[in-house]
């Protein structure tokens, strides 16, 4: 029997410090690990939060900048309040209604990658 367990998107980055500021400092992800083949070589790292895992790579062939990741989640209002309260100077995302009956918080990282965090209105408890 075929079973797909988990998808981990790989996003292209160009600066580890900026990536950590955005993913850990702004979005609240944990940096699980960081790998370099040698000193002064490109980084490959894993960040995660609440069941979502992302790989971030400075390696040229791993991914294209400007990718989009679509994420289903719950607690979108709390998430939006939390990240907006951090005062990240480059982004202040709101919650948008979508045509597919969801609420979406879209963020764009310093490298042009988009993450669309979505909460299904049909599955979300009434507020």
Describe each PLM feature range:
Residues 1-20, 32, 67-69, 119-127:
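N-terminal beta-strand motif that seeds the catalytic metal site of vicinal oxygen chelate
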Residues 61-62, 98-99, 120-124:
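A short acidic/small-residue loop/turn micro-motif
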Residues 47-50, 107-110, 120:
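Active-site beta-strand termini and strand-to-loop segments that position acidic
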Residues 55-57, 106, 116:
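Conserved beta-strand in the GNAT
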Residues 38-43, 63-65, 98-103:
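Short acidic/glycine-enriched loop/turn segments that link adjacent beta-strands
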Residues 10-53:
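Core segments of cupin and vicinal oxygen chelate
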Residues 14-17, 69-114:
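Vicinal oxygen chelate
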Residues 50-54, 61-63, 75-78:
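Short, charged/polar surface micro-motifs in flexible loops or helix N-caps
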């Amino acid at each position: 029997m075929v079973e797909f367990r988990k998808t981990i998107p790989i996003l292209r980055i160009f600066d580890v410090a900026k990536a950590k500021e955005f993913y850990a400092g702004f979005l609240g992800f944990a940096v699980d690990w960081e790998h370099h083949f040698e000193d002064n070589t490109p980084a490959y790292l894993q960040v995660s939060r609440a069941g979502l895992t992302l790989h971030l790579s400075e390696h040229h062939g791993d991914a294209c900048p400007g990718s989009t990741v679509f994420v289903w989640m719950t607690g979108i209002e709390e998430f939006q309040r939390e990240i907006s309260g951090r005062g990240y100077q480059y982004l202040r995302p709101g919650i948008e209604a979508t045509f597919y009956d969801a609420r979406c918080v879209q963020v764009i990282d310093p490298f042009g990658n988009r993450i669309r965090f979505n909460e299904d209105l049909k599955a979300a408890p009434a507020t």
